[in-house]
Amino acid sequence: MNKTVETFDPKQTTTLETPAKTLAAEAKASDGTIQGNRIGFVSLGCPKNLVDSERILTQLRIDGYEVTNSYDNADLVIVNTCGFIDAAVEESLDAVREALEENGKVIVTGCLGAKENQIREVHPDVLEITGPHSYEAVLNHVHKYVPKPEHNPFTSLIPQTGVKLTPKHYAYLKISEGCDNRCTFCIIPALRGDLDSRGVGSVLDEAKRLVESGVQEILVVSQDTSAYGKDKDGRTDFWNGMPVKQDITSLARQLGKMGAWVRLHYVYPYPWVDDLIPLMAEGLILPYLDLPLQHASPRVLKMMKRPGRVDRQLDAIKKWREICPDLVIRSTFIVGFPGETEEDFEMLLDFLREARLDRVGCFKYSEVDGAVANTLAELISEEVKEDRYERFMEVQAEISAERLARLVGRELDILIDDVDEEGAIGRSYADAPEIDGMVFINGETELTPGDMVRARIVASDEHDLWAELVALED
């Protein structure tokens, strides 16, 4: 069961489960049908890394390679790594070790690939290492060790949207790379560089292809979604002969006209986030805001190099909910940041009680190699971190239960993700895949993943909802 308040677990929070399941299913379905050389593939990390994996896999298929999730019958294995926090680094290094032991020929890419010396020190036998979004370099390395098949009669079978590691009814849409912020606990700019926004026409073209292929939910991701277009100085681009400004509000407005759910992730709390709320109230995009706030103590926020006016944030949340009463706010916070005092932590709890956020992730501070925060102040003991985490979770669990209870009795659109012998499992507008809760519709075994249904909410807890089917929508 997915949780509203979660601790850090690489299998849940850093590495999504769905891509591995999808890759395994596709490999099984195509096993032996493509007479080309086989490439094993492991995709770790967040949705942004998942999109990188999809691009590499698409080009591999175009080049005639068969992709498999099995090491022993692959000619080579690619491991797309995560390097965000130390637990993710350990998971990535373990995956490389397993690939070397099972196969012996391994190419490493992704965020951890930006730290080649660290990988070579542990795994000197790795063939090649590239950093994140190095698609061309990865393919060139593959061609070097496993020559490209001369003929691939199956190229025409590759969907227009490319290979996807998500179910057919939802997809991640990455709108930019890198980040211009310098949060002291984060090393993403060192791994992925400064902000580099895609052209708005390119983004909208991809979104249109996704919707035309049957995607019903577009999850917009980047390192800093609300900063989209800042590096382009808000210049106007053109799409379908129409001028569109390169900023997140203009992009969201156009995405909202395509007829799919549009969900925004990783929205940094800039002032212009205010402009997105009316789009949610109008129903153009989902009234769901993934807004990582990280803390509520002005002193800690200053050490983090994050926006520090908590009173302004509370005022903003109040104003947003007045404009869009159905708004669901997800956020993440760090407890046990170096130098965090009991007073700082109590400020965080007070903020939770006043803000009444819907979905919250809590992370115990983890030392990240190269992060400035490690040297700012005395590190907090693991015992204190655990105590603060448990107290945080206890407070937020009660709030989450209260926020979900308000949905009981309402009819909501539910997007079905899975069906088993007990019934259907889906998500409402309040639930992003894998990180939020689920909606259980017991007894409805005739539904299909990708169905959009109308359901009446009959029960809730602090994480999930239970519903009764009202109607199957077109």
UniProtKB/Swiss-Prot annotation:
Check the record and name the InterPro entries matching this protein: Elp3/MiaA/NifB-like_rSAM, Methylthiotransferase, Methylthiotransferase_CS, Methylthiotransferase_N, Methylthiotransferase_N_sf, NA-bd_OB-fold, Ribosomal_uS12_MeSTrfase_RimO, rSAM
Domain (TRAM) spans 405-471
Q: Which family does it belong to?
A: Belongs to the methylthiotransferase family. RimO subfamily.
Q: Where does [4Fe-4S] cluster 1 bind?
A: 46, 82, 111
Q: Which NCBIfam families match?
A: 30S ribosomal protein S12 methylthiotransferase RimO, MiaB/RimO family radical SAM methylthiotransferase
Details of cofactor binding: Binds 2 [4Fe-4S] clusters. One cluster is coordinated with 3 cysteines and an exchangeable S-adenosyl-L-methionine.
State the organism of origin: Shewanella amazonensis (strain ATCC BAA-1098 / SB2B)
Protein name in the entry = Ribosomal protein uS12 methylthiotransferase RimO
Which reaction does this enzyme catalyse, per its entry? L-aspartate(89)-[ribosomal protein uS12]-hydrogen + (sulfur carrier)-SH + AH2 + 2 S-adenosyl-L-methionine = 3-methylsulfanyl-L-aspartate(89)-[ribosomal protein uS12]-hydrogen + (sulfur carrier)-H + 5'-deoxyadenosine + L-methionine + A + S-adenosyl-L-homocysteine + 2 H(+)
